């Protein structure tokens, strides 16, 4: 007797959930709505200048997606990921061997300067030591383990036709011990 009364009381307190979450009328309206054409998004192979790295932006009153809002290097990275290309080549360097002067570990770079972090050979045998390689000085040796890294420049070739020396800042790289070693010792 007591059990049947509590079951009836609980049933009265429970709210009935609607069978449909939204009305059918709004669903029909959404299905019949015209879709706006998506603005043309340039493919990675179509990007030639910095101006190609500006997105269309969002329509007024809407929240932009990452693709619509991104510009510059961020947009280049997103477009590359959409096509399955790792634009910045974030793979770790070859740690299966020790780099030597005859067979250095290759580091690709699209800029004039590239940093590489050496963790030693075998891997993680010492703390990270950051080495700086430039186009003028593409080979660097780790002072801790002796690993040798070489920068392979893959960026655009220099065009000196319109260069009048305005960018030259007069900085000379400081000399190191390697500058004083005789060539026959290399």
From Swiss-Prot:
The record's InterPro entries line, in alphabetical order, gives: Cyt_c_oxidase_su5b (IPR002124), Cyt_c_oxidase_su5b_sf (IPR036972)
**Domain of life the protein comes from:** Eukaryota
MF annotations from Gene Ontology? cytochrome-c oxidase activity; zinc ion binding
Q: Which GO terms describe its cellular component?
A: mitochondrial inner membrane; respiratory chain complex IV
Its quaternary organisation is: Component of the cytochrome c oxidase (complex IV, CIV), a multisubunit enzyme composed of 11 subunits. The complex is composed of a catalytic core of 3 subunits Cox1, Cox2 and Cox3, encoded in the mitochondrial DNA, and 8 supernumerary subunits Cox4, Cox5a/Cox5, Cox6, Cox7, Cox8, Cox7a/Cox9, Cox6b/Cox12 and Cox6a/Cox13, which are encoded in the nuclear genome.
What family is this? Belongs to the cytochrome c oxidase subunit 5B family.
Its recorded name reads Cytochrome c oxidase subunit 4, mitochondrial
Organism source for this protein?
A: Neurospora crassa (strain ATCC 24698 / 74-OR23-1A / CBS 708.71 / DSM 1257 / FGSC 987)
Which taxonomic lineage does the organism of this UniProt entry have? Eukaryota, Fungi, Dikarya, Ascomycota, Pezizomycotina
Quick one: which gene encodes this? cox-4
